[in-house]
């Protein structure tokens, strides 16, 4: 259902970009002379094949590495991360087509669909990972929301925010200027709500770590030294870095839309890579080294049934 809502939003938004073009224009001329002022060019620039090639290679290789990690160490519940990395690389590859044919509606819509849709899988992976990490540590009492509800609650918020965005994008495809402006405001509200939802998730995660550090020294400090690939705090740091990358991208997309499709952010390719593509890349490539399956053993969990002073602690149910 979440993916269906996301798909509807992306299709509507892509249509809105096309509908915003002036009507009764003369046939397009040379698309490479002045792309910024070319009403037939939805990007308003010609994509760089160098940046596209480097970015595509990074994402494709990372997706393959993540798939190998999953095969080697398990944690199939992170499958959405692997799929999202592959689909994002497909979106980047489509930019090769736009560099040759910048007027192609079909290529643009497909490119936009993959590039904007794929990060949904990255958010979902972080939601799922936090739930598994908390259950593995038997530390549900330090999380404000039950671990098994974290994913459900935040994915539900995604469905609502994407539905709002889809509604706004659909209104933006009309010919009435007032309706178009209203649709853009609704779409921006949905995007801002999505950003707020993930920011809330990140805050929830930070509070969980702080409470764990203050109240559960038997979990925070290992009784015996363990290698880095068995130290849950290394995985926790990786999740934190992933959240930072996703938040950067979320802020970028929100500000970009508030400026409009001809704004500075939307029409500057370097900002697309610097504030969208590469922050998201950091958010996923970190799991190549810190693959959750190396840290989280669903059979053997951290034993927290006894605290430092010997007081029994109830084990969190899976």
Where are these regions (language model features)?
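Juxtamembrane membrane-water interface segments of multi-pass membrane proteins
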Residues: 69-76, 100-104, 133-147, 176, ...
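Cytoplasm-facing ends of alpha-helical transmembrane segments in multi-pass membrane proteins
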Residues: 60-67, 116-143, 159-173, 197-215, ...
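Extracellular loop 3-seventh transmembrane helix
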Residues: 108-122, 165, 183-198, 230-292
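Intrinsically disordered, low-complexity terminal tails of fungal membrane proteins
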Residues: 1-27, 210-231, 292-318
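Membrane-proximal first intracellular loop
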Residues: 2, 14-119, 123, 132-135, ...
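Helix-to-loop junction signature of class
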Residues: 89-102, 164-175, 205, 245-260
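Seven-transmembrane alpha-helical bundle of G-protein-coupled receptors
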Residues: 52-62, 78-91, 115-128, 154, ...
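Membrane-water interface of alpha-helical transmembrane segments
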Residues: 42-52, 75-78, 105-115, 141, ...
